[in-house]
């Protein structure tokens, strides 16, 4: 029997209402007012939580010469990776301000750290939930640091093999972590319908014995509707 997990008075697990997290991430582009506006939009839409990213660029980028090409507002943009991440990096006081805004709107504030220092920052904020990035599922020291906090943790599994998910779950539990949620995720943007693979949700639940969520990168609402048949 899977034990429900309590997140700020909201239950996640069998029989509980769907817990909806709105992904803000770094989509505020470093604009604090835009981040506040996105919190309000998420609250007005009925979300339970919003998620940000907290990081220091120097913790995961070692050079400033790498460039990144992406699509923004329908246009292809190429720029320095360092400059892009620095522009979107939120200072501690801004994160604290956003957390207070979430509390006023009855939203769970949570965030994705990229280092142990980022985990400690969220602990100081009194975070009620932590989450990794799929690209950090194989960063076992970070997962152990998250587990050691005792805070409920979401591990996203995009791009991972089953063996890598096994390793991450064992690392979390061996480090004392108890309240674990896994996210079924396909790291394609957008995800083609043929790659959504909702049948992986009951398979993960049976293997790991914990609540399984869905990180959806597909277009439209079809996958969100179809998930009902995958969890019932």
In which residue ranges do the predicted regions lie?
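Catalytic cores and adjacent flexible loops of soluble metabolic enzymes
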Residues: 1-232
């Amino acid at each position: 029997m899977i034990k429900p997990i309590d997140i700020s008075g909201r239950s996640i697990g069998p029989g509980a209402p769907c817990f909806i997290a709105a992904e803000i991430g770094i989509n505020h582009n470093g604009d604090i007012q835009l981040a506040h506006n996105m919190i309000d939009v998420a609250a007005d839409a009925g979300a339970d939580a919003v998620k940000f990213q907290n990081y220091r660029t120097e913790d995961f980028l070692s050079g400033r010469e790498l460039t990144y090409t992406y699509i923004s507002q329908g246009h292809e943009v190429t720029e320095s990776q360092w400059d892009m991440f620095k522009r979107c990096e939120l200072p501690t006081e801004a994160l604290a301000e956003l957390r207070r805004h979430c509390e006023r709107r009855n939203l769970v504030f949570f965030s994705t750290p990229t280092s142990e220092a980022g985990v400690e920052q969220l602990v100081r904020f009194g975070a009620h939930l932590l989450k990794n990035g799929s690209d950090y599922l194989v960063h076992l020291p970070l997962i152990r640091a998250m587990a050691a906090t005792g805070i409920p943790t979401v591990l996203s599994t995009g791009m991972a093999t089953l063996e890598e998910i096994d390793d991450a779950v064992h690392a979390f539990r061996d480090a004392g972590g108890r309240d674990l949620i896994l996210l079924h995720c396909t790291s394609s943007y957008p995800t083609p319908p043929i790659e959504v693979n909702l049948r992986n949700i009951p398979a993960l639940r049976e293997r790991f014995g914990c609540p399984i969520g869905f990180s959806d990168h597909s277009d439209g609402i079809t996958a969100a509707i179809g998930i009902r048949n995958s969890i019932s």
